[in-house]
Amino acid sequence: MTEGNFVDYVKIHVFSGKGGKGSAHLHREKYITKGGPDGGDGGRGGHVILKGSKNLWTLFHLKFKRHVKAEHGGNGSKQRSSGSQGSDEYIDVPLGTVIRDTETNEIIKEITEDGQEFIVAEGGMGGRGNWHFKSSTNQTPRYAQPGVDGQQIDVTLELKVLADVGLVGFPNAGKSTLLSVITAAKPKIANYEFTTLKPNLGIVEYRDFKTFVVADIPGIIEGAAEGKGLGHRFLRHIERNSTLLFLIPSDARDIKKQYDILLDELKRYNPELMDKDRLVAISKSDLLDEELKAEMAKELDKELQLPYIFISSVAQSGLTELKDKLWQMLNREPV
């Protein structure tokens, strides 16, 4: 998937189908001059339905599909024949899609399961045929109901990636490299900021065929909560993660300060993110000798007051312990 193909935000206008008209037909047959009403009902208009698909990872297929329209219901006809029901229009979306009313910005629904369906615009009911209106005082009603108009609504679809662990760090912290060595993912890796322009997902194969999903969230910079850098576009993906893994390089000028800045950005974006489990991974630990690592650990024990681990993606050290800690946190086991 190329960067341009990762689309996590689209606006579309949906129209459900109008209900078909009821028929005002009067029965006509040879030798029967005063046949009664036999007009059939109109068919229901088609719904517009959003459906979750585990085979989609992006909203790219909707990037150029700004209008979605369902079929109108068929009109009723003689002999009480009902009109055909309008075909429903399905819109497949990836799991983790949030549906908002564009006008009010209100969340209407979230699609989180494969096959989950949600009617975003209901088709109009078909009108009733004239036979429904026959009475003792009106044996031949010539009135039939028109079909009910379909619904129209502007909706905004936002994708929030579904993953167990979210990798959080400044640009160029080595998140993509870590993801590539603990999973089979192949993210773009280069030594410049914002290499990652989309969340990359990787599946960690743990012991006894157990697995969990890690998402490499594009680099956060100071001010991201106000929209700087890649801003809100990617911060929302973190909302889905149950555990946050902060990646800070060992050669950072001040590890505690970097952690505090990252945490503050998340807090300002959404205070509820503070309820998530957190683990700090000190990367590039292959640059440290044992004496320096021990000295750094002593400082971190005082300052961080949360679990941390030294790792090296290049030397592939500390990675088994990292997987163990993440698995324990995901399953609420003592770390």
UniProtKB/Swiss-Prot annotation:
Listed GO biological process terms:
ribosome biogenesis
- DNA damage as a keyword of this entry, yes or no, is no
Q: What is its EC number?
A: 3.6.5.-
A GO MF annotation of the entry reads:
GTPase activity
Entry keyword annotation includes Membrane: no
Annotated keywords: Cytoplasm, GTP-binding, Hydrolase, Magnesium, Metal-binding, Nucleotide-binding
Record-annotated OBG-type G domain positions: 163-331
Location of the Obg domain: 4-162
**Which InterPro entries does this chain map to?**
G_OBG (IPR031167), GTP-bd (IPR006073), GTP-bd_Obg/CgtA (IPR014100), GTP1-OBG_CS (IPR006074), GTP1_OBG_dom (IPR006169), GTP1_OBG_dom_sf (IPR036726), OBG_GTPase (IPR045086), P-loop_NTPase (IPR027417)
Q: What is its main location?
A: cytoplasm
Q: Biased composition, Low complexity: where in the chain?
A: 77-87
- Which cysteines pair up through disulfides? They are none
Q: Name one Pfam family in it.
A: MMR_HSR1
Residues bound to GTP = 169-176, 194-198, 216-219, 283-286, 312-314
**Which Gene3D superfamilies does the UniProt entry name for this protein?**
GTP1/OBG domain (2.70.210.12), P-loop containing nucleotide triphosphate hydrolases (3.40.50.300)
Cofactor names: Mg(2+)
Q: What class of enzyme is it?
A: hydrolase
CDD domains referenced in this protein's UniProt entry, alphabetically: Obg
Record localization: Cytoplasm
Q: Which GO terms describe its cellular component?
A: cytoplasm
Task: Kindly state the subunit structure of this protein.
Answer: Monomer.
- Matches recorded under HAMAP family: GTPase_Obg (MF_01454)
Q: What family is it from?
A: Belongs to the TRAFAC class OBG-HflX-like GTPase superfamily. OBG GTPase family.
* Function summary: An essential GTPase which binds GTP, GDP and possibly (p)ppGpp with moderate affinity, with high nucleotide exchange rates and a fairly low GTP hydrolysis rate. Plays a role in control of the cell cycle, stress response, ribosome biogenesis and in those bacteria that undergo differentiation, in morphogenesis control.
Q: What is this protein identified as?
A: GTPase Obg
Q: Which organism is it from?
A: Christiangramia forsetii (strain DSM 17595 / CGMCC 1.15422 / KT0803)
Which gene does this sequence derive from?
Answer: obg
